[in-house]
Amino acid sequence: MTETTPKTAPWTVQKRTAVLVLADGTVIEGKGLGATGAVEAEVVFNTALTGYEEILTDPSYAGQIVTFTFPHIGNVGANAEDIEDLTPANRHGAVGAIFKADITAPSNFRAAEDLDSWLKHRGIIALAGIDTRALTALIRERGAQNAVIAHDPNGNFDLDALKARAANWCGLENLDLAKDVTIGQSLVWKELPWTLQDGYGEQDAPQYHVVALDFGVKRNILRLLTGLGAKVTVLPATATAEDVLAHNPDGVFLSNGPGDPAATGEYAVPTIGKLVETGIPLFGICLGHQMLALALGGRTEKMHQGHHGANHPVKDYTTGKVEIVSMNHGFAVDSDSLPENVEETHVSLFDGTNCGLRVVGKPVFSVQHHPEASPGPQDSHYLFRRFINLIRERKGQAPLPESEQAA
């Protein structure tokens, strides 16, 4: 009998097929996934454990590369129902993604394809196999980083050229990205929130009419409005106050979106200022919140690293309660700049930054976080009922209980 010695495959070093090049010249190598090519963007980190498809398709992430701090990715696959941008063909949202581990094979009854294939279809360049904790710590210490992410299956990179691109990119300040992600023409949104029994239904008996200005709106925001009985007419970001009022709305919604609020505000702030004076109930989220503050005489500023995640504690001064919310913003309202007739209603318990405001004596309010998201409990869904109640009050109707869930 011949003895055989068990053989152990030697360690292999995978060839780099993707790189992240920071503006300071730092090069991080790893495995490329998703689309190929190279793109400049701002690198941020997101602390959410779930919802990667919703995160990557959120138009507020336009011009950004998302580092996922949770190590596992791809376990629920991807589908066409969980995207957040209004026009999937235009692929608005994050341009890059960074993962600790390789993509996991999907195991979910709603999965239509694996994450790698989905990234390719969306045109998102991804980098895996790096120390995301170290990158997150770097961003925490130095701030959000301008960078280039590149993917070449052959591993051929001109690092000097990529370093130059990263160093010369202008960054998000002074960039109006809302014009790139907004719809081209108006539309009426009727889709209702998803249920296990029926999927997405359709609103067929609206009680109110809300006009939404689309600076990069998420689908689930619109669904929660229709779920409360609203017909929602969505208008492009460049719509004027006259355009909005021509639809005779019961309420006006200012959506989330990407980029610098001061840049988008060049055309949006005058519109918002006129709408505030009409007495029509007005509700803003994220970028809409920031531009409302500008219209009221406040200021906004670029944040060091921004807030991106689903575990952010926010205090609502109007109720005294603390909510765990989803956030995605790199600019913030300067609380000290708000005029006397504007009250701060919400504040971040992480760093004390402004997260909400209301105008004294007017049916106008806004929040920085995303109340449509549900990181566990639906802590902030009451804000949609608060908006609808302002509409009902103007119509002489009794208010809905805020404590009930909106979806």
UniProtKB/Swiss-Prot annotation:
Protein source organism: Brucella suis (strain ATCC 23445 / NCTC 10510)
Catalyzed reactions per annotation: hydrogencarbonate + L-glutamine + 2 ATP + H2O = carbamoyl phosphate + L-glutamate + 2 ADP + phosphate + 2 H(+)
One GO BP: L-arginine biosynthetic process
Domain of life: Bacteria
NCBIfam families, A to Z: CPSaseIIsmall (TIGR01368), PRK12838.1 (NF009475)
Residues that coordinate or bind L-glutamine: S60, G257, G259, L287, Q290, N328, G330, F331
The protein's name in its UniProt record: Carbamoyl phosphate synthase small chain
Record text on subunit structure and interactions: Composed of two chains; the small (or glutamine) chain promotes the hydrolysis of glutamine to ammonia, which is used by the large (or ammonia) chain to synthesize carbamoyl phosphate. Tetramer of heterodimers (alpha,beta)4.
